[in-house]
Amino acid sequence: MKWKIIADSGCDLREIENLAPDTQYINVPLTVQVGDKHYTDDASLDIDDMMIEMYQSKDQTASACPSPDAFLEAYKGAENVIAITITGGLSGSQNSAQLAKNMLLEEAPETNIEVFDSLSASGEMVLFVQKANELIAQGLSFEEVVAALKDYLASTKLLFALARVDNLVKNGRLNKLVGAVIGMLNIRLVGNASPEGTLNLLHKAKGQKKAVQAVWSEMKKNGYKGGRVVISHCSNPEICGLIQAAVHSEFPDADVSSIHTSGVCSYYAEQGGILMGYEA
């Protein structure tokens, strides 16, 4: 195998369409813990079942990163490895991936490997993985692919809109009263990924349509000019259609796609939420 593209399941993409020649894509799963149950975030995960259990449980919930060994097994067997993880601000996945890189280079020092911290998650990671595949398909060298991906990652952004905040309340990150008010008043929390890779609240919007307006306003404020958009949603295709309509109202040829959030991204976005990546 000449190339491997590795992402943890902070990337919602389970497989790549039109995979570049002599290339393999592997999605390394995180796990979500609800009480005494552990859900492995792979293609067999029943996300709806996990979400039901999560909302019914009064116990704290947590996500856990893949082990270095899990990344190492994914890395092995290719001349060139491109890897990306969910932001180090939310998970230890980046640390595991870097440890695995060091382990790989001890075993196979001739391997070319680059491990990226997305400083983001979900839709923005999908954009990165798709771009990596396109660059490899062009026949570029490892160094050229890495340089292009560094530039690309600096040009993409993440926006989120949350309809529920049960996990934030349950895990002590948000006041119970604030969480209850958000639910009762149909408030949507709209924000972005900060340059440091943490989630940053920008707006409190009343209802889904106002949330879409806030998302679209932020996109334009950040220099959106009709680039690719990937909307990762947790069981909310309606908001995807509204965002697509907003984008196409000014950029009718823009490539806007949607995908259901992975298990760990469903855990963070919660029911009705989105984690959207776009090219600024």
Show where each model-derived region lies.
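Active-site cofactor/cluster-binding pocket
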Residues: P66-K101, L105-E106
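A short helix->loop->beta-strand "cap" motif at the edges of active sites that frequently abuts
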Residues: E110-T111
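Short beta-strand segments
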Residues: I6-A7, T85-T87, D117
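N-terminal glycine-rich anion-binding loop in soluble enzyme alpha/beta folds
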Residues: K2-A64, A70
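Generic beta-sheet signal
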Residues: W3, V81-A83, G227-V229
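Mixed-charge interfacial surface used for oligomerization/domain docking
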Residues: G10-T31, L90-S93, A97-N102, E114, ...
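Flexible, charged surface loops at secondary-structure boundaries
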Residues: M1, Y75-A78, N222-K225
